[in-house]
Amino acid sequence: MQRKTRWILGTLLTAVASTVLISSFQRPIATLLLEQMVHKNVGRNIIADLSDGLHLALCGTGSPFPDPTRAGPCSAIIAGDRLFIVDTGEGSARTLGYMGIPAAKIEAIFLTHFHSDHIDGIGPFLLQRWGVGTFQTPTPVYGPTGVDQVVDGFRAAYVLDFGYRVAHHSPKIMPPGGSGGKGMPFALPPTGQGDQVVVLEDKGLTVTAFRVDHAPIDPAVGYRFDYKGRSIVITGDTKKTPSVQALSKGVDILVHEALQPKLVKLLETEFANQHMNNMSQVMRDILNYHTTPEEAAAQAAAAGAKELVLNHIVPPLPLRFAYPAFLGDASKFYDKPITVGEDGMLFSLPANSVLIEHKKLY
């Protein structure tokens, strides 16, 4: 008994001494740890470590729903050492930073349509590219008709902030001409006369925009990126539509939005039970202009896509345990890999190869 008592007292004294010791040295220990973190993360640039090829980084796989694990819709495309962003959902600029992809490397932004959840994070992208990259000209922002109105609106909202930063840091650090964005609108052919148009062709990269069906939102487009024998399609928001299948023929990765109606109907019912009738109606409405995981899988199979990645996940999935319920019967329609997109995922397609490599950056 005495031995046991001594052991307990010794353990308590050791714990107390350790606590006192840690408390005494907490400040220098924390400073040292923070110094190491700063050294590791400042200037981090994963693009420099990637092989030549086409790469897809998911900087936002969420939707307008609150979701602690997913930012708003955003995909980063890296072609060789060039960086492009598709859609700029809220929080996605921070996610890009977590992934070690510097906003200063952005050459252009592409918007699929002008729903708020696809554009509400564009301000931080424009600001970070300008502030870190010291660009002399605004960020090009490509999109269908109306993109210049959207970009000009954000510029108007940020114009005071731009002025403050130039005044504080000097025009040398923040060149006034580089602030904001420049809308680069493109027109799709009239319906029935072709659904696609090449919007960028440069240094081996071809970006093709194609019409999708997100009615009543019009225009709405997806994008196909082709580089050195590799290809990625990003649909943007759409219900099942033939143009996605047509433009995804033989694509390496099809990034398709997905909504699971069975789970959305749970929300619809609960909103009604809580007498939140407006939200219950919204849950019913969103069912008619999105694509189910099963439909996305069927599209991927018909197109001969090598891999299907689902994004714009509706409703939010708090745990991976919920993924099978979200996917439903998708595997019955497509026998190749299906990935429920998560923020921080990186897919690498080495040039002139058939490999698809996966990595989680954070």
Name each region found by the language model.
Residues 2-232, 320-355:
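Binuclear metal-dependent hydrolase catalytic cores
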Residues 356-362:
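A polyampholytic, Gly/Pro-enriched intrinsically disordered region
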Residues 212, 260-261, 359:
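Short glycine-rich anion-binding loops that position phosphate/pyrophosphate groups of nucleotides
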Residues 2-11, 15-19, 221-222, 228-233, ...:
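Cap/insert and terminal regions of metallo-dependent hydrolase folds
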